[in-house]
Amino acid sequence: MFGPYAAAALFLVSIVVWVALSLSADPAQTALELTLPYEPASVVGVLTVAECVRLIEHATPRLARSKTIGDVVSDTRTSEQAWVDASEPSAGDIVRKIRARAAQLTGVFRPDLFEQVQVVRYGAGQEYRPHLDACVEGCDRANKPRINRRATLLVYLTDDFEAGATHFAAIGTRVRPKRGDGVLFYNTDADTGAELAASLHAGEPVASGTKWVANCWVRFDPAATRV
């Protein structure tokens, strides 16, 4: 629904404020409320350093070329990725911890609305050009409410690399969380499931070193109050 130009146009008339939050992992904490257009928010302490290392070690043997929505290999995304499920004995506890933090922030606790966690590795020169995590015009519109990604919790598993920031292109904001920290942003409207221009973002090219991140996606459910 929103391309890069539409996103830029929207934000020329929008007042956008970066929301920096230092949140505890207390499950009793109320859901993070963000006003339209759902500015990205920093999230501190999602994982420990040891958990980041373990998740990387678990994902490494199964890495494959990253794909875009529709299971397509594209020059727009040149990283490698692996999927990790909450049921896996060696790393499932880490997936569950990431999901729990995403649930705490979004107010969504239904397991069926969480995808597997996607672990991504970016080597030198690798990137993910500006894109939306939600379903775009090429998707099956009839299935869109079921498959659309409502929110993204992006966790940085390393921070010892050069460049490679997450760039929210429409508002000109670059973020580079510390290892174990993340950024939360909404991809779709809570009521309609339509894509939000605020979520347009890119993984900029890594200059040197290796960047590892983990994506946790919460899907849109038109019957739910928040997602």
Q: What feature does the model see in each segment?
A:
Residues 1-227:
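Fe(II)/2-oxoglutarate oxygenase catalytic core
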